[in-house]
């Protein structure tokens, strides 16, 4: 089923938003390929894009630079489009150690990974939505440029079921196993099916909560329905349903056997090359590893590391780019690149790092040369595959300006009337003493302070010194994982401490209305952390407070500082003029402090058959868990949920299911 994008919001566009939406939509319909949306912090860039999506009515891919921002955008778009398919496509690895070889120490490191099955389910849901409906918006990271199964294989393998269709049960089961579904008569879990008489139950790999029941009679589909796999309760009847493969890498038996033949040919050719170079150890190693993989593929259809043979499985020529999420997009889709000044350089860097590691594996006989084609897209390949695009940033880079050829739409006026922070320059010599007095002044007003330094050592020393002065302060460093980072930011907003010190973690996507002062130490030291873009982004962290200020501690004004100050002043001037013309009095953003890690903090009291009552052990504070541990916790709870279902304790099973759902949302952070 497909419909139209329907934006749900209690607000209507204001400030620069109506003009920006109109211009972006007009340019899109005119066929303009690249546009820039230059939007200041708090100007409603996400809401503006949501309005554009509603008006153009095209499938949309939104790319973010990291999982944290992707999760934030996913939540916002999900709220804007509750009746449409808003999907999430990020790396499904909680932990990933790629295979590698270190020649200097003759050390081979085996691939080791931990897959988050909930993220995998969301990835499958994203590709299914792209192939089956037009009202779909996918939020992704650079994971979107990595190799995926070919969409034509994914589509050709699907099992299309219709009411009244003739299909033998044995034929149905065979097709499900080709889709890599496993038969499980005890637990109907995601990616499995069970057979009871003439009823076949299937739990689609991309489904979050609903399973499919196929009722046959005399070789004919008599009934199709979705049901709750926990309670068995029917959710709704269906006329038609498509079961998609359990994995993006599923392929036909014929294609697999064909790939085995071409891999054998490549192996023979490369072994001759290695023997010719007198690399006997490498040749023996390669022959042994590859022959084992070939036997596994011929017998069971897959092997560990099968992605290294993806070129053979997809029938691509050597050097051809792999199929990616971009191949699932229709030609008329819209691509939105959020924080483009960070995301675009990331896209260019992915290929180079991947290539050097694999070249070493090939050279020393751990992989065939075709493994080099299991890779992310090169930057130029990504450019070719990108549909019409909008680059969104407060500080677009030179690439975005060049590609958009002057099509820059500005979003400088905030709906709240807030103006950009006032900037002051103060001397370096007295920066610490001055900073203490500024912090104390902010604390008296109940405000918070962000301080950014150049080095880790300076951040640590400053944190220690200010703490000795009685200031409640925390240090946000690169070793802190995503979940703990969110907890620290929440604690700052709650007032558990007043000052947050960081190096390069205080720029994009931090929404803290309580922060009224940003202090940038050693602002005159030119470099990546003190570039024009970095300075503007950091200054913008104080833009959600009516008392927002930025202090740059510097002995001279560098070119980057001058550009950042001039641009901020230009924006302030336009914002002041708009407020004066419309009689708007600036007021700070008021945003509730929601605990995104809430839920599942309390023990769930349930009954265990024959064992009296028990309380399932649930950690009191998920801030202490990383994403891998959260995934393990969800897996444990899921096992308990299915046990309750088998014991016919459906209320208890449903309660744990709700807990898993809250945990899953927390894990997206």
From Swiss-Prot:
| Superkingdom as given in the UniProt entry | Bacteria
Q: Give the UVR domain ranges.
A: 631-666
Can you tell me which residues bind ATP?
Answer: 39-46
**What are the Helicase C-terminal domain coordinates in residue numbering?**
431-597
Sorted alphabetically, the keyword list is: ATP-binding, Cytoplasm, DNA damage, DNA excision, DNA repair, Excision nuclease, Helicase, Hydrolase, Nucleotide-binding, SOS response
Residue ranges of domain Helicase ATP-binding in the record: 26-183
Per the record, the major location class is cytoplasm
Molecular-function annotations in GO: ATP binding; ATP hydrolysis activity; DNA binding; excinuclease ABC activity; helicase activity
Kindly give the Pfam families that the UniProt entry links to this protein: Helicase_C (PF00271), ResIII (PF04851), UVR (PF02151), UvrB (PF12344), UvrB_inter (PF17757)
Question: What is this protein for, i.e. what is its function?
Answer: The UvrABC repair system catalyzes the recognition and processing of DNA lesions. A damage recognition complex composed of 2 UvrA and 2 UvrB subunits scans DNA for abnormalities. Upon binding of the UvrA(2)B(2) complex to a putative damaged site, the DNA wraps around one UvrB monomer. DNA wrap is dependent on ATP binding by UvrB and probably causes local melting of the DNA helix, facilitating insertion of UvrB beta-hairpin between the DNA strands. Then UvrB probes one DNA strand for the presence of a lesion.
**Quaternary structure and partners:** Forms a heterotetramer with UvrA during the search for lesions. Interacts with UvrC in an incision complex.
Q: What is this protein called?
A: UvrABC system protein B
Gene (UniProt): uvrB
């Amino acid at each position: 089923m497909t419909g139209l994008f329907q934006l749900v919001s209690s607000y209507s566009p204001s400030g620069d938003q109506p003009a920006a939406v109109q211009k972006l939509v007009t340019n899109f319909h005119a066929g303009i390929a690249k546009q820039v949306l230059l939007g200041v912090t708090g100007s409603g860039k996400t809401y503006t894009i949501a309005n554009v999506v509603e008006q153009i009515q095209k499938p949309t891919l939104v790319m973010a630079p990291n999982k944290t921002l992707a999760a934030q955008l996913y939540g916002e778009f999900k709220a804007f489009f509750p009746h449409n398919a808003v999907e999430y496509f990020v790396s499904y690895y909680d932990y990933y150690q790629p295979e590698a070889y270190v020649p200097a120490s003759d050390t081979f490191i085996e691939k080791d990974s931990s897959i988050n099955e909930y993220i995998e389910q969301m990835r499958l849901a994203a590709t299914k939505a792209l192939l089956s409906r037009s009202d779909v918006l996918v939020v992704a990271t650079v994971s979107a440029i990595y190799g995926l199964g070919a969409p034509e294989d994914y589509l050709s393998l699907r099992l299309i079921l219709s009411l009244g269709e003739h299909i033998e049960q044995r034929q149905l089961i065979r097709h499900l196993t080709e889709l890599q579904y496993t038969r499980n008569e005890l637990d109907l879990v995601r990616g499995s099916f069970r057979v009871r008489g003439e009823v076949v139950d299937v739990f689609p790999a991309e489904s979050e909560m609903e399973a499919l029941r196929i009722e046959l009679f005399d070789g004919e589909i008599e009934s199709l329905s979705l049901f709750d796999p926990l309670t068995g309760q029917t959710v709704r009847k269906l006329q038609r349903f498509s079961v998609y493969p359990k994995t993006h890498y599923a392929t036909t038996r014929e294609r697999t056997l064909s790939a085995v033949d071409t891999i054998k040919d490549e192996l023979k050719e490369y072994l001759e090359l290695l023997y010719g170079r007198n690399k006997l150890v490498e040749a023996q190693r390669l022959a042994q590893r590859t022959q084992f993989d070939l036997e596994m593929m011929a017998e069971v259809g897959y092997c560990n590391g099968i992605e290294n043979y993806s070129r053979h499985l997809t029938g691509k020529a050597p050097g051809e780019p792999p199929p990616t999420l971009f191949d699932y997009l229709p030609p008329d889709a819209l691509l939105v690149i959020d924080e483009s000044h960070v995301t675009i350089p990331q896209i260019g860097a992915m290929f180079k790092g991947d290539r050097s590691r694999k070249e070493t594996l090939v050279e020393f006989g751990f992989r065939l040369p075709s493994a080099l084609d299991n890779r992310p897209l090169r930057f130029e390949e990504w450019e070719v595959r990108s549909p019409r695009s909008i680059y969104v940033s407060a500080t677009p880079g030179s690439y975005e300006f060049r590609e958009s050829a002057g099509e820059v739409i500005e979003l400088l006026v905030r709906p709240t009337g807030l103006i950009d922070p006032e900037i002051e320059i103060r001397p370096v010599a007295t920066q610490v003493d001055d900073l203490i007095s500024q912090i104390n002044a902010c604390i008296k007003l109940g405000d918070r302070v962000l301080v950014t330094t150049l080095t880790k050592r300076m951040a640590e020393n400053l944190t220690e010194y200010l703490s000795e002065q009685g200031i409640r302060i925390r240090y946000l460093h690169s070793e802190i994982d995503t979940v703990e980072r969110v907890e620290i930011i929440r604690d700052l907003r709650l007032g558990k401490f007043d000052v947050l010190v960081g190096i390069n973690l205080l720029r994009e996507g931090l929404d803290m209305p309580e922060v009224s002062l940003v202090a940038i130490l050693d602002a005159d030291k030119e470099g990546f952390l003190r570039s024009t873009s970095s300075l503007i982004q950091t200054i913008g962290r104080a833009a959600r407070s009516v008392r927002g200020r930025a202090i740059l501690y510097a002995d001279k004004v560098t070119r980057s500082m001058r550009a950042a100050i001039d641009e901020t002043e230009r924006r302030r001037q336009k914002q002041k003029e708009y407020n004066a013309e419309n009689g708007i009095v600036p007021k700070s953003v008021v945003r509730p402090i929601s605990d995104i890690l809430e839920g599942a903090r309390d023990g769930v009291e349930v009954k265990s058959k024959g064992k009296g009552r028990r309380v399932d052990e649930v950690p009191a504070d998920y801030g202490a868990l990383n994403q891998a541990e959260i995934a393990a916790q969800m897996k444990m709870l899921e096992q308990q949920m299915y046990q309750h279902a088998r014991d016919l304790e459906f209320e208890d099973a449903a309660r744990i299911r709700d807990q898993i759902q809250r945990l899953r949302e927390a894990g997206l952070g």
